């Protein structure tokens, strides 16, 4: 067996003391079984001291109740209601925008809404020209329908489209 140096021995004793003080502390919920004094302790003025062994610190209950108490303390009910109202309003706006975008994507994916009635019968005939001079083709009419749907959805979505059209000529690079 090798001899331990003084530093190792001191570290070992320190570790044992720290382990016993942490595992037997009142905060851990354990009591000192054999060290409890039977007599009351008094301070300098003769007043009885508080019994720390029978005292339950606040928050010893469930962690969830401690979180609720802290939440109620830092966030009063009136401020919480205002915050929830603002959050719900912003959430509704985001959901409206997402649903409008999803609708736009579905319309564009279907071919600009040519089959909006929901009929399952697709016309297998190839695209034909609408006028004899060939200026207006089906692809151009499809493009016009797409632009009409985009403008309508932009009007529904609001201000964002106006800013995009306003800044169309100049592109701003964001860092």
Curated annotation (Swiss-Prot):
GO cellular component: extracellular space
Lysine amide PTM positions: 168
Modified residues (Leucine amide): 157
UniProt KW Signal keyword: yes
Annotated knockout phenotype: Knockout mice show delayed recovery of axon regeneration after crush injury compared to wild-type mice. No difference in motor neuron survival after axotomy compared to wild-type mice.
Main location: secreted
Keywords on record: Amidation, Cleavage on pair of basic residues, Hormone, Neurogenesis, Secreted, Signal
Signal peptide (residue range): 1-24
Propiece residue ranges: 25-78, 172-175
Cellular location(s): Secreted
Gene Ontology terms: biological process: adenylate cyclase-activating G protein-coupled receptor signaling pathway; adenylate cyclase-modulating G protein-coupled receptor signaling pathway; insulin secretion; negative regulation of cell cycle; neuron projection development; neuropeptide signaling pathway; positive regulation of chemokine (C-C motif) ligand 5 production; positive regulation of cold-induced thermogenesis
UniProt record similarity statement: Belongs to the glucagon family.
Protein name, UniProt field: Pituitary adenylate cyclase-activating polypeptide
Organism encoding this protein: Mus musculus
Native organism taxonomy: Eukaryota, Metazoa, Chordata, Craniata, Vertebrata
Gene name of the record: Adcyap1
């Amino acid at each position: 067996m090798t001899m331990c140096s003084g530093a190792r021995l001191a570290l070992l004793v320190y570790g044992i003391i720290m382990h016993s003080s942490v595992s037997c502390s009142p905060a851990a919920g354990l009591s000192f079984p054999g060290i409890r004094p039977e007599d009351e302790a008094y301070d300098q003025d003769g007043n009885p001291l508080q019994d720390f062994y029978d005292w339950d610190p606040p928050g010893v209950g469930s962690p969830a109740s401690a979180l609720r108490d802290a939440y109620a303390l830092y966030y009063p009910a009136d401020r919480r209601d205002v915050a929830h109202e603002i959050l719900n309003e912003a959430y509704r706006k985001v959901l409206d925008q997402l649903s409008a975008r999803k609708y736009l994507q579905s319309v564009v994916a279907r071919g600009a809404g040519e089959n909006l009635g929901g009929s399952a019968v697709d016309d297998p005939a190839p695209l034909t020209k609408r006028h004899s001079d060939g200026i207006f083709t089906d692809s151009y009419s499809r493009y016009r329908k797409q632009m009409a749907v985009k403008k309508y959805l932009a009007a529904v979505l609001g201000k964002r489209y106006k800013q995009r059209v306003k800044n169309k000529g100049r592109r701003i690079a964001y860092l």
